[in-house]
């Protein structure tokens, strides 16, 4: 009888643990679904604006009214709007790939990856007359998904270039080095001449978050750049932060 009581007690404990885990899993699924709904609601809102602009331009040109008689001007504006929409759709596809694809890492020379990304951005940096300071070792290897890390470096560099004012003395500084132990790396990208309100820092990795309402439309950003960076770094188990420095903004991560 005593043994039966122990077995029953053990079974009840296991059932209780299983129920608690089930509740936890259900709650987690609810949170994920809530985030997914919020994300697609934001996507719908973000696409609605350029579609409305396009519709207005095309309607005005077809009717030939007022300022819309200058068809070449509004055709150019319409093309720019569709290019922004195309950029957003590409970023949305990236989000989908990150969420659905099997995450595979391999030993990768991320120093070479970062150098190539900087070379690709050289013209953008020169066009804004920004100073570029680079400190990258000849080689630095890490177990990463190389395609996804390319996206991290690309988004971070583009973000720094877009939001650095075109003023004399402003610069972008890129640092890559071994981390505090031999298995990790540390990367830092800093841009000067701009600051982010402290209350906005915690929201920067949210999809479509804007520090200022007009910021993305002025700079051409999709509103998904840092959100994608966050997703990729989370999958790599990396730690990261973004904050103000004495003369600008700095993003850093370790993995």
In which residue ranges do the predicted regions lie?
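Conserved signal-transmission helix
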Residues: 6-35
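Primarily the dimerization/phosphotransfer
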Residues: 27-61
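Short alpha-helical segment of the dimerization/phosphotransfer core of two-component systems
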Residues: 77-85
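Coiled-coil phosphoacceptor/dimerization helix of two-component systems
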Residues: 84-96
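Conserved catalytic submotifs in the C-terminal HATPase_c
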Residues: 106, 126, 131-141
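Short conserved segment of the HATPase_c
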Residues: 196-210
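Conserved glycine-rich
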Residues: 237-238
């Amino acid at each position: 009888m005593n043994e039966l009581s122990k077995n029953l007690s053990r079974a009840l404990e296991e059932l209780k643990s299983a129920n608690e885990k089930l509740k936890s899993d259900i709650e987690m699924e609810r949170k994920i679904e809530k985030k997914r709904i919020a994300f697609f609601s934001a996507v719908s809102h973000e696409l609605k604006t350029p579609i409305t602009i396009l519709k207005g331009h095309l309607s005005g040109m077809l009717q030939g009214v007022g300022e819309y008689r200058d068809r070449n001007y509004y055709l150019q504006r319409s093309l720019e709007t569709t290019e922004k929409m195309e950029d957003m759709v590409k970023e949305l596809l990236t989000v989908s790939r990150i969420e659905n694809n099997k995450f595979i890492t391999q030993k990768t020379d991320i120093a070479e990856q970062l150098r190539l990304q900087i070379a690709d951005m050289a013209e953008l940096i020169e066009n804004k007359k920004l100073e570029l300071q680079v400190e990258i070792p000849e080689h630095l290897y890490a177990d990463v998904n190389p395609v996804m890390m390319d996206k991290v470096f690309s988004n971070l560099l583009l973000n720094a270039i877009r939001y650095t004012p075109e003023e004399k003395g402003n610069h972008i500084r890129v640092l890559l080095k071994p981390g505090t132990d031999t298995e990790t790396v540390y990367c830092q990208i800093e841009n000067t001449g701009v600051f982010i309100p402290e209350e906005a820092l915690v929201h920067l990795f949210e999809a479509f978050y804007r520090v200022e309402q007009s910021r993305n439309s002025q700079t051409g950003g999709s509103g998904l750049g840092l959100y994608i960076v966050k997703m990729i770094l989370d999958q790599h188990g990396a730690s990261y932060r973004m904050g103000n420095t004495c003369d600008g903004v700095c993003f850093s991560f370790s993995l």
